[in-house]
Amino acid sequence: MTKITIPTALSAKVHGEGQHLFEPMAARCTCTTIISSSSTF
């Protein structure tokens, strides 16, 4: 939090990579939940 002098482009790049890593993980979790819930029927 002390590094407020970070360029916006760099922080946007890091945020973009964070989203890139998080999106597949969230999608996989959602797919697993749907599969497990549908297999209980």
From Swiss-Prot:
Example GO BP: killing of cells of another organism
5-methyloxazole-4-carboxylic acid (Cys-Thr) cross-link, chain position(s): 29-30, 31-32
Proregion span(s): 1-27
Subcellular location: Secreted, Cell wall
Entry-annotated residues carrying N2,N2-dimethylarginine: 28
Covalent link Thiazole-4-carboxylic acid (Thr-Cys), residues: 30-31
Transmembrane segments: none
Any Gene Ontology CC annotation: extracellular region
Keywords for the protein's UniProt record, in alphabetical order: Antibiotic, Antimicrobial, Bacteriocin, Cell wall, Methylation, Secreted, Thioether bond
Domain of life: Bacteria
InterPro entries linked to this entry: Plantazolicin
Residues joined by cross-link Oxazole-4-carboxylic acid (Ser-Ser): 36-37, 37-38, 38-39
Residue location of crosslink Oxazole-4-carboxylic acid (Ile-Ser): 35-36
PTM field: Maturation of thiazole and oxazole containing antibiotics involves the enzymatic condensation of a Cys, Ser or Thr with the alpha-carbonyl of the preceding amino acid to form a thioether or ether bond, then dehydration to form a double bond with the alpha-amino nitrogen. Thiazoline or oxazoline ring are dehydrogenated to form thiazole or oxazole rings.
Cross-link 5-methyloxazole-4-carboxylic acid (Thr-Thr), sequence positions: 32-33
Protein known as: Plantazolicin
Record organism: Bacillus pumilus (strain ATCC 7061 / DSM 27 / CCUG 26015 / JCM 2508 / NBRC 12092 / NCIMB 9369 / NCTC 10337 / NRRL NRS-272 / CCM 2144)
Protein's gene: pznA
